From Swiss-Prot:
Has the structural arrangement of an alpha-helix connected to antiparallel beta-sheets by disulfide bonds (CS-alpha/beta). It comes from the Eukaryota. The modification Asparagine amide is found at N85. Expressed by the venom gland. This is Beta-mammal toxin Css4. It comes from Centruroides suffusus (Durango bark scorpion). Changing K37A: Has little effect on the binding affinity to rat sodium channels.
């Protein structure tokens, strides 16, 4: 019974730690990474994993790379005090 409670608690903790999602952002310009092939996209998957680690995923959503399974402190679009090339 104690083992079952520990397993349940661990699964709940993992779900909260890896819950963040968001657009991949260029930290210098404040712009989202653009993509044109909507849905599963090798470019977005590769860029998300490069920036956030192997555990993350990525696909093209609304012409921007959307990253999934991020850690809570991951930086995603929009950046505070930074607009995309003044737009």
């Amino acid at each position: 019974m104690n083992s079952l409670l520990m397993i349940t608690a661990c699964l709940a903790l993992v779900g909260t730690v890896w819950a963040k999602e968001g657009y991949l952002v260029n930290s210098y310009t404040g712009c989202k990474f653009e993509c044109f092939k909507l849905g599963d996209n090798d470019y977005c998957l590769r860029e998300c994993r490069q920036q956030y680690g192997k555990g993350s995923g990525g696909y093209c959503y609304a012409f921007g790379c959307w990253c999934t399974h991020l850690y809570e402190q991951a930086v995603v679009w929009p950046l505070p005090n930074k607009t995309c090339n003044g737009k």
